């Protein structure tokens, strides 16, 4: 019998951004209008020069222009738009230039603070440049002197957008057309981190200088209850506390409230910037040391070290009258203050699974 060895996991597959999809479909539709070419695939150049070919679902003339569509393939990334049909409609204009329109399922900017002005379709700068560059080159190749009106659509985009940060950012009516490299890196979470940064930018631009960064729904509810903060001031950071703290170096606010489950706050207290279990773990011996610093005896410390979960460790300490929640928040506060600018006032809340506050450190002046 042969020895069994663990299989090597297959490498994760990269995908292409909505910006790449919009570029490919716009180019195919424009090429049909200017050259009569009905394509089933189209090749585009990504921002760093790599050429990729994308398969088209359709490429056809319409009453007043042409349209082409492709299925968004995010590779192995758990992207909300994976498998969605993205299609672009192109009309020719007499005057040179590119005019962008938000079609079905693509949002419109309604709040200041984003990279696009209020009223603009949520087609980000890099996708706009990609589309413009490809259509400009096509015009030069065909001798066309006019311009293009490009309407980007995502089938079902209105519903998909509700699963993103767009409504909170003031991007209404659908999704954003995104991408800086044209490529989706599996589990890079780049889009999520970008939405955290945008959330801070939008809050500050709209005059909200006290923000609460929360790990999930329960912590958001706690911050609403404690401060009655509006939606725009609540930053859904998930596990990416580092994305919040580092961005505040560039875009400082007056006050930052950090709120999360006790276990995640204990990871922050230990100096972790990514609170996901893939990148950091609960350190029960460290919890025992912190408990010792505020009076836990040897028996209690041993019980904390032997706990099954951070919540159990907290319950053991609380039953003994040791305020472990506050002590963990104090260490988390110290670490957070070491990252953000000195002018940013910081406080930290730890909550239980029901949203009850089990620890707090820091007080606003």
From Swiss-Prot:
Signal peptide: none
A single MF term (Gene Ontology): cobalt-precorrin-5B C1-methyltransferase activity
Family membership: Belongs to the CbiD family.
SUPFAM superfamilies cross-referenced by the UniProt entry: CbiD-like (SSF111342)
Name of the encoding gene: cbiD
Record carries keyword Ribonucleoprotein: no
InterPro entries in UniProt: CbiD (IPR002748), CbiD_sf (IPR036074)
Pathway(s) per entry: Cofactor biosynthesis; adenosylcobalamin biosynthesis; cob(II)yrinate a,c-diamide from sirohydrochlorin (anaerobic route): step 6/10
Organism the protein comes from: Pseudomonas fluorescens (strain Pf0-1)
Keywords for the protein's UniProt record, in alphabetical order: Cobalamin biosynthesis, Methyltransferase, S-adenosyl-L-methionine, Transferase
Entry-linked HAMAP family: CbiD (MF_00787)
EC number: 2.1.1.195
Reaction(s) catalysed by this chain's protein: Co-precorrin-5B + S-adenosyl-L-methionine = Co-precorrin-6A + S-adenosyl-L-homocysteine
GO BP annotation list: anaerobic cobalamin biosynthetic process; methylation
Protein name from the UniProt record: Cobalt-precorrin-5B C(1)-methyltransferase
Ligase in keyword set: no
């Amino acid at each position: 019998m042969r020895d069994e060895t663990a299989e090597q996991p297959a490498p994760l597959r990269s995908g292409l951004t909505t910006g790449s999809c919009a570029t490919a479909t716009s180019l195919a539709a424009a090429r049909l209008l200017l050259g009569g070419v009905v394509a089933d695939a189209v090749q585009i150049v990504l921002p760093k020069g790599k050429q990729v070919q994308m398969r088209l679902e359709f490429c056809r003339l319409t009453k007043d222009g042409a349209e082409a569509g492709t299925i968004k393939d995010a590779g192995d990334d758990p992207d909300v738009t994976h498998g969605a049909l993205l299609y672009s409609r192109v009309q020719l204009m007499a005057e040179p230039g590119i005019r962008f329109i938000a079609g079905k399922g693509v949002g419109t900017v309604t709040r200041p603070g984003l990279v696009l002005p209020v009223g603009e379709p949520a087609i980000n700068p890099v996708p706009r440049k990609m589309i413009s560059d490809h259509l400009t080159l096509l015009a030069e190749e065909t001798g066309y002197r006019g311009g293009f009106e490009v309407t980007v659509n995502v089938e079902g985009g209105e519903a998909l957008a509700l699963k993103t940060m767009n409504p909170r950012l003031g991007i209404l009516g659908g999704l954003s057309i995104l991408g800086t490299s044209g490529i989706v890196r599996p589990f890079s979470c780049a889009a999520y981190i970008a939405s955290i940064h945008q959330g801070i930018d939008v809050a500050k631009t709209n005059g909200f200088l006290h923000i609460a960064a929360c790990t999930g729904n329960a912590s958001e509810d706690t911050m609403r209850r404690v401060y009655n903060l509006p939606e725009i001031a609540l930053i859904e950071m998930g596990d990416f506390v580092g994305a919040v703290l580092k961005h505040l170096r560039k875009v400082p606010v007056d006050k930052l409230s950090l709120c999360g489950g006790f276990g995640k706050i204990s990871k922050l207290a230990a100096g972790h910037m990514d609170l996901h279990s893939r990148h950091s773990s609960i350190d029960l011996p460290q919890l025992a040391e912190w408990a010792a610093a505020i009076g836990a005896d040897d028996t209690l410390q041993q019980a904390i070290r032997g706990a099954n979960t951070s919540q159990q460790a907290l319950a053991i300490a609380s039953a003994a009258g040791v305020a472990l929640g506050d002590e963990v928040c104090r260490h988390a506060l110290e670490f957070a203050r070491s990252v953000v600018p000195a002018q940013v006032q910081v406080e930290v809340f730890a909550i239980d699974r029901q949203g009850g506050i089990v620890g707090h450190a820091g007080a606003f002046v």
